[in-house]
């Protein structure tokens, strides 16, 4: 039985946030098509994960060197391990998030920091870093109210680009990406843009 991990990084309700609606649509469509799959859903805002900083980094280093950890470091390392192992054990992963202020919401950056661990999702070699998580099937769902398809705007899109870059670093070089954009910039076509985008989400979910 496949293990599927759904990761949502938006705490706004689906009726107010397109990426939340994309997530909801994908999950419901996938569950309907795959009733016997083992599914785990992570709502990153609800988890309120501690920032990845000195305590977790020092704890990870000390553990790798066989050094004794403080209680605080033990707790931080255990939290990182929990989510890292969950990701590594998943056969399929879906990320859903908006573009806020040109990038992803902060909880997703924290979560990705937990996952980006040398020896686990990538390793260092003489020829540079090498990804270790390439066997996973991944879908990226992104929403942005403005249209970032133009030559002027494209470099400012640091949400989907950030996530797919990190995935590539981990060896996941071909994630399927669905983006809904421009629904705020083009209010006269907003409903059509969202509806067509959600149809694409359903198609991807049905065959995932």
From Swiss-Prot:
Q: Sorted alphabetically, which keywords does the UniProt record give?
A: Flavoprotein, FMN, NAD, Oxidoreductase
- The name on file for this protein is FMN-dependent NADH:quinone oxidoreductase 2
User: What does the record give as EC number?
Assistant: 1.6.5.-, 1.7.1.17
The similarity comment for this entry is:
Belongs to the azoreductase type 1 family.
Q: Give one Pfam family.
A: Flavodoxin_2
According to UniProt, the reaction catalysed is:
2 a quinone + NADH + H(+) = 2 a 1,4-benzosemiquinone + NAD(+); N,N-dimethyl-1,4-phenylenediamine + anthranilate + 2 NAD(+) = 2-(4-dimethylaminophenyl)diazenylbenzoate + 2 NADH + 2 H(+)
Q: How does it assemble?
A: Homodimer.
Q: Which cofactor does it need?
A: FMN
Q: Does the keyword Oxidoreductase feature in the UniProt annotation? A: yes
Q: How is the cofactor bound?
A: Binds 1 FMN per subunit.
What are the GO MF terms of this UniProt record?
electron transfer activity; FMN binding; oxidoreductase activity, acting on NAD(P)H as acceptor; oxidoreductase activity, acting on NAD(P)H, quinone or similar compound as acceptor
Coiled coil regions in record: none
Signal peptide residue numbers: none
Q: What does this protein do?
A: Quinone reductase that provides resistance to thiol-specific stress caused by electrophilic quinones.
Q: What SUPFAM superfamilies has UniProt attached to this entry?
A: Flavoproteins
């Amino acid at each position: 039985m496949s293990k599927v991990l759904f990761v949502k990084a938006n705490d706004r309700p689906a009726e107010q946030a397109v990426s939340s609606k994309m997530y909801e649509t994908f999950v419901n469509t996938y569950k309907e098509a795959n009733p016997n799959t083992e599914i785990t859903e992570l709502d990153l805002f609800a988890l309120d994960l501690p920032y990845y900083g000195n305590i977790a980094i020092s704890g990870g280093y000390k553990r790798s060197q066989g050094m004794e950890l403080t209680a605080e470091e033990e707790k931080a390392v255990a939290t990182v391990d929990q989510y890292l192992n969950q990701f590594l054990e998943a056969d399929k992963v879906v990320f859903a998030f908006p573009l806020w202020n040109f990038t992803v919401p902060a909880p997703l950056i924290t979560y990705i920091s937990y996952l980006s661990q040398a020896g686990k999702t990538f390793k260092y070699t003489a020829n540079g870093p090498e990804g270790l998580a390439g066997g996973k099937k991944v879908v990226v769902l992104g929403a942005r109210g403005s249209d970032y398809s133009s030559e002027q705007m494209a470099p400012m899109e640091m949400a989907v680009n950030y996530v797919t870059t990190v995935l590539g670093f981990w060896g996941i070089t071909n994630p399927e990406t669905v983006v809904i954009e421009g629904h705020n910039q083009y209010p006269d076509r907003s409903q059509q843009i969202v509806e067509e985008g959600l149809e694409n989400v359903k198609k991807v979910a049905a065959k995932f």
